[in-house]
Amino acid sequence: MTRKGIDVSHWQGTIDWNKVKKAGIEFAIIKAGGSDAGFYTDSKWEANYKGAKAAGIPIGAYYFVGKDCVTAAAGKADAERFLHILKGKQLEYPVYMDNEAQPASAKAGTTEATIAFCKTMEDAGYFVGIYGSAVSGFKERMDDTKLTPYAHWVAQYASKCSYKGDYGIWQYSSKGSVDGINGNVDMDYTLVDYPTIIRSGGFNGYTKAAYDDNTSTTPAPVTPAKTVDELAKEVMDGKWGNGTDRKERLTAAGYDYSAVQAKVNALVKSRNRLLSTTP
């Protein structure tokens, strides 16, 4: 099912989240902070987090890195700052590294910084992703072939998304109009049920679902091995984690990670073809 969302920051001023909810918005990605003007927390982060939560709108967050985030050390430092801002909060959508400021000439360094950022966030228990434009971001500023383990939020203001890789959210306009928000707002679509994946997986401040808790002392019944198709569906439902965690868990369970991931990629591409023509 396609879900319509928005992404916001202090630029949208004071938002009436109840009106936003009534306008049919089903999720929001909120700016938490950045490093493009020194380390800072977005001035509307707390108000937007509390307002969206109170209105019952599932949320994610993003962190805008500066032009100097072109080393692994810088990526790790930005992630640690992001973690500080997110402490004590629960988010139903991924937490994103926003790569827009780094120059194309620093592509290799930006890629290293991005991997370090994402690994730091993953190690802290977050479902992490990367934001970038379909062309100038993932093609010119980053080596996207090294970033496939992480969720992608792709920006392309057009009637369809031409990005060829796997992505979870498409930002299709910067000139949306939504009741409760003064002026223009970025608009997004997703076909991924991130809230279920994140809550059941115990990411982003949530406790892992009780049914997936392995602390019971009662021996588990022996079950037959699952097919690749069955495993791929479970991966899509968030039952095998994300990134390196997914690979380790599938391998430890005796399954062929490469075969399962190939099936997942095929399913995601099929879903993306549908998403790319949504507007």
Give each language-model segment a name:
Residues 1-118, 122-126:
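Substrate-binding cleft of extracellular glycoside hydrolase catalytic domains
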Residues 1-18, 145-222:
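Functionally critical loop-and-helix segments that line ligand-binding/catalytic clefts
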Residues 81-96, 101, 141-167:
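Structural recognition of alpha->loop->beta junctions
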Residues 121, 125-139:
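Aromatic-lined carbohydrate-recognition surfaces of secreted/lumenal glycan-active proteins
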Residues 222-240, 269-279:
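Disulfide-bonded cysteine-rich modules in secreted/extracellular proteins
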Residues 234-247, 255-257:
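Extracytoplasmic Gram-positive cell-surface binding/anchoring modules and repeats
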Residues 253-275:
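Repeat-associated, polar segments at repeat-unit boundaries in modular proteins
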